[in-house]
Amino acid sequence: MENLDALVSQALEAVERAEDINALEQIRVNYLGKKGELTQVMKTLGNLPAEERPKVGALINDAKERVTVVLNARKAAFEEAELSARLAAECIDVTLPGRGQATGGLHPITRTLERIEQFFTHIGYGIAEGPEVEDDYHNFEALNIPGHHPARAMHDTFYFNANMLLRTHTSPVQVRTMESTQPPIRIVCPGRVYRCDSDITHSPMFHQVEGLLIDRDINFADLKGTIEEFLRVFFEKELAVRFRPSFFPFTEPSAEVDIQCVMCSGNGCRVCKQTGWLEVMGCGMVHPNVLRMSGIDPEEFQGFAFGMGAERLAMLRYGVNDLRLFFDNDLRFLAQFR
C-alpha cells in the first residue's frame, strides 16, 4: 500500500502544478483513465488472497476518490477564472440604447381615405361598399349615362365582355344602396376604380370616394355647406372654395369644386397653372331619372351626390407632384408618412 500512497501523492502534486484545464485532463487520463496507474493497481486485486481483496479494494477506491475530488476542485477553479476573464473582456454597457425595430406605417392613401371617412361618419354618414366587377346597368344605365356617351368607349373602360366591366367610379354602390334602402340615405362609398388612363396625374387604378344624401327638402345649399365644411376640416385651414357650373349625366344641376391653391395661397404657381385655383371634386343634385330608376319618387325625395379622388387629395395635402409615387412601393418615399 506504500506504492498506492506514493501514487496518490504524485497525482495530487501533478494537480497542483497543472496550469490549465488541458493539463488537468491529461493528469486524469494518466491516473484515472482506463490505462491509468490507479486503475492498473485495481486490476492487481485478483492476485491477492480473497480475504484481503475487500480491504485493499476499499483503499484503492478511497485513493481514487481523493484524487478525483482534488482534480474536480482544481478544474472548477480554472473554469471560474476563465469565465471571469471572459466576462471582463466582454463587458457590456447596459446603458447603451437597444436595437430599434423597423416599424411600418399607414400608406398615405389609406391615411387619406380614413381621414375622409372619419369626417363623414362623424356627421352621420354610413360607409357603403360594392363589387369592383360591375355590370353595365349599374355602372352606366342606372346613372343616366346613355349608350352613346363617351365614357362607354373601349379606350376609357376595361371591359370583360359586352355586359361586365371594371367599375369606372363608385357610383354603382350608390345605385345599389338606393335600390335596397328606403330614404333617408346618407352614405360615402370609398373604393378602387379603374380607367384606361396613365400619366403623371392619372393611374389605371385609383381610389375614389363618392357621397350620397337622399331625404326630403334637400337643396344645393345643403350640398354646398357639406363640401365647404369637409374641405376646411380635411386641409385644416380656411380655404376659399368656388363652385363652377358643369355637367354630369347623373346630377342636375352639376358643379366642379375648386379650392384656393394650397401651394401658393392663390397667388399663382406651376401647380395651379398660375390660376390660383385647384379642382378637387365634382358634385350636384341627384338627377330625377337616377332616382326613378332606383325606385325613389323624385317628387317626394331629393338628394345630392359628390365624388373625389383620394390620390388627388393626398397629393395636395402632402405636396406630392407625381401620382405614380404612391404605387411604386419605394420605402424611402413611404417612410415620410409614418
Swiss-Prot record:
Keyword rRNA-binding tagged: no
Reactions it catalyzes: tRNA(Phe) + L-phenylalanine + ATP = L-phenylalanyl-tRNA(Phe) + AMP + diphosphate + H(+)
Subcellular locations according to the entry: Cytoplasm
UniProt cofactor note: Binds 2 magnesium ions per tetramer.
GO cellular component: cytoplasm
GO process annotations (BP): phenylalanyl-tRNA aminoacylation
Family annotation (Gene3D superfamilies): Bira Bifunctional Protein, Domain 2 (3.30.930.10)
Cofactor(s) essential for the protein: Mg(2+)
Binding-site list for Mg(2+): E252
Segments crossing the lipid bilayer: none
InterPro entries attached to this UniProt entry: aa-tRNA-synth_II (IPR006195), aa-tRNA-synth_II/BPL/LPL (IPR045864), Phe-tRNA-synth_IIc_asu (IPR004529), Phe-tRNA_ligase_II_N (IPR004188), Phe_tRNA_ligase_alpha1_bac (IPR022911), Phenylalanyl-tRNA_Synthase (IPR002319), tRNA-bd_arm (IPR010978)
Entries under PROSITE patterns matching the protein: AA_TRNA_LIGASE_II (PS50862)
Top class in the EC scheme: ligase
Keyword ATP-binding in annotation: yes
Principal location: cytoplasm
Keywords, comma-separated and alphabetical: Aminoacyl-tRNA synthetase, ATP-binding, Cytoplasm, Ligase, Magnesium, Metal-binding, Nucleotide-binding, Protein biosynthesis
Enzyme nomenclature, EC number: 6.1.1.20
Pfam families, sorted: Phe_tRNA-synt_N, tRNA-synt_2d
MF (Gene Ontology): ATP binding; magnesium ion binding; phenylalanine-tRNA ligase activity; tRNA binding
Listed NCBIfam families: pheS
Subunit note: Tetramer of two alpha and two beta subunits.
Family to which this protein belongs: Belongs to the class-II aminoacyl-tRNA synthetase family. Phe-tRNA synthetase alpha subunit type 1 subfamily.
Name of the featured protein: Phenylalanine--tRNA ligase alpha subunit
Native source species: Pseudomonas putida (strain ATCC 47054 / DSM 6125 / CFBP 8728 / NCIMB 11950 / KT2440)
Lineage, opening ranks: Bacteria, Pseudomonadati, Pseudomonadota, Gammaproteobacteria, Pseudomonadales
Gene: pheS
